[in-house]
Amino acid sequence: MSVLFALFQFLKPYQVRVWVFLAALIFTAGVTLSIGQGLRLVIDQGFAEQSQSQLNLAIIFVLVASALMAAGTYIRFYLISWLGERVSADIRTSVFDHIVDLHPAFFETNRSGDIMSRLTSDTTLLQSIIGSSVSIALRSTISFTGALIMLLITNIKLTFIIVVAVPVVLIPVLVFGRKVRKLSRESQDSIADVGSYAGEIIQHIKTVQSFTQEAQEKRAFSVEVERAFAVAKRRVSQRANLMAAVILLVFGALSAMLWVGGTDVINGDMSGGELGAFIFYAILMATGVASLSEVYGELQRAVGATERLMELLYAENHILTINSAQDVSRLAAVLDFKNLTFCYPSRPQQPALMDFSLTIAKDKIIALVGPSGAGKSTLFDLIQRFYDPQQGEICFGDCNIRQLDPRELREQIAVVQQQPTLFTGDVMYNIRYGKSSATDEEVMAAAVAAHADEFISKLPNGYHSDLGEQGVRLSGGQRQRIAIARALLKDPRILLLDEATSALDAESEYKVQLALDKLMKGRTTVIIAHRLATILHADQIVVMDGGRKVAQGSHQQLLKSSPLYARLAKLQFSADAVISSET
């Protein structure tokens, strides 16, 4: 019930339309029931009495009722279809709005393909069910109730047969309905698995083809599809059992009723018109039960889809936005890490940082070096408050960042990653992502400062050239300069660089380095360094290993005081020397 209550909350803004729909539904059901009386008049007064005038009146009555029923059906169908589309759109928007605010830890334990399936497939299913199945269920319920009342008015003895049959019919509905609901949830989960798998393969299609794994991936995908089909087959089987059982029981009861009623007509205990009207109401009642049995499975699917969507909508955000009175822009651009210990939620027994302390002064350049898994990228995540440490604190200026609004904090920070993220869209859109209110002139100025204008102007449509998915139409160096232009446009006070030149050729590296030098000027900068030659200019170099800070100093100081740094320097500079001698 809580799931359905959550769904009904999305209908509250449209109460007027809901009430008009219900009025049209009740009106249409009432008109439909009146047709049974028209049928009785046609038989008793038109046929039995052989009166043309009475027949004409009865036919006119039926035609008027049919016209009213058509008008009511139009209003009912339009409104419920509109509500289905509107509510599914509102749910989709609400879920997406909540998802983009969730902490990154949520996405460690929830696959993107599954989330996409819920946003698309489940909301589409809800739209179909609200716009169709709910209407059928309500109409069938009202028709069933109204037909039962008319049956009692027409003939109590025959109604007794129908009333006895109803509980018998409801038994398979309840038994199979529970199974259908469970299997519907499993089916939707398995379909989401298929979507997740396909999305991952398509995203990494070059790697798949490079390793000639097409045949293996086809087989693996086929296994996922067949697994989803197996669950769907069980669900369909249960629904088929439900429908077959209901039809058999309903029409069995109708047959018994016809036999008793026909006998009464032969004996003169009731008129042919009364029997005709009774048959009409009985069929209406039987149709209502049959429709309910069919729709019941759809409604169970709706419950499953709603559960999956509500899980996303009510997922708790561990990094809360607070109404802080502190103006972040007035705080000094100083970062102070105090005794940090942090484990990722997906690896709670494996600390990524242990008792880590470091102070980064305003406008200074700090480089982080160390082997893979040392905790360098984790620091970037914590600075942006994607996670909160289990122990210790991080201060921006003299304020603990837990006391700051995460959005306001992130407004002060820009990141340039080793593999920059670009979105499907044109150059202008991707650079303006750093500052949505920026004018075209400001975007172009940032591109010029990032040494990106020289290649952007050569693109087919200049700044309005589409970059493709993830910027696939640009080289690595070009993508980096777009990312730097975006960071320049944001004009942050703290800059995080994840070795932005490590994967570039010499010419691209030179141009990117020029852009980075301009970007770092006058900003507190933290660099993750994979190549020590790129950070010799840093004010301080911090050596990390196993989540701990093991040394800190200048390049020359660390060569003497840190065996780990000296070993890394020897390996890298010796390799560079060998490469230089060979060329």
Where are these predicted regions, by residue range?
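Membrane-integrated ABC transporters
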Residues: 1-31, 35, 47-61, 76-80, ...
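Transmembrane helices of ABC transporter permease
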Residues: 13, 17-28, 135-186, 257-270
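Alpha-helical segments in transporter systems
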Residues: 16-37, 58, 62, 80-81, ...
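Juxtamembrane helix-loop junctions of ABC transporter transmembrane domains
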Residues: 23-24, 31-44, 65-112, 116, ...
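Helix-loop-helix
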Residues: 51, 150-164, 238-307, 312-313
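Conserved catalytic Walker-motif region of ABC-type ATPase nucleotide-binding domains
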Residues: 99, 221, 309, 337-339
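ABC-type nucleotide-binding domain
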Residues: 322, 329-583
